[in-house]
Amino acid sequence: MTYVLLGAVSFVFFYLFDVFNIKGKSFLKVSFALIGLITFIYSSYKIAFLGSSIFFHKGIRLISALLFLISLFLLFYSLFLELPFKKTYGEKDYNNGLITTGTYALCRHPGVLWFFFMFIFLFFYTGSTLLLMAGLIWTSLDILYVYLQEKYFFQDMFKDYKKYKKTTPMLIPNLKSIKRCFKTIK
């Protein structure tokens, strides 16, 4: 349970990343992003391979491993490749333009989708019962985090964000957004 809480604390660090991002404090922004990321990866690793587990058939485990890797790639793609990396995560200037194409045409927070699927498939691969609980708790915290981003940060960071909210679902893609995603993905 300690690692579940440690993983939860990483979301506080991610929130502080946004606070210092909007204040233009690049050193603190990067520091809290790295602390949050390292804390989260460490917690996830420990939970995935510790404690009791359920046995799943080898075929389920293999398919789940593949789907986990796809989800992990999509998470990395959405957060670190589609967004301009240096401007988003490194520079002082936070207003780097709103991305509305690719996976960001699918929904406003595609990382939350990939995050959820990543933990579901990792559970079916490892069988870790604690991982299932942690994944659900952390996904709930991720949803709270993106809600807070929308409420307190993104309106100020991106001038067209209100328009984007009207045209793109927050978390659950619809048929129109799925078509727009495939049409604009690079």
Pin down the residues of each PLM region:
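Membrane-anchoring alpha-helices and their flanking helix-loop junctions
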Residues: M1-T100, M118-K186
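Histidine-centered phosphotransfer motif of kinases
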Residues: T100-T101, A105-L113
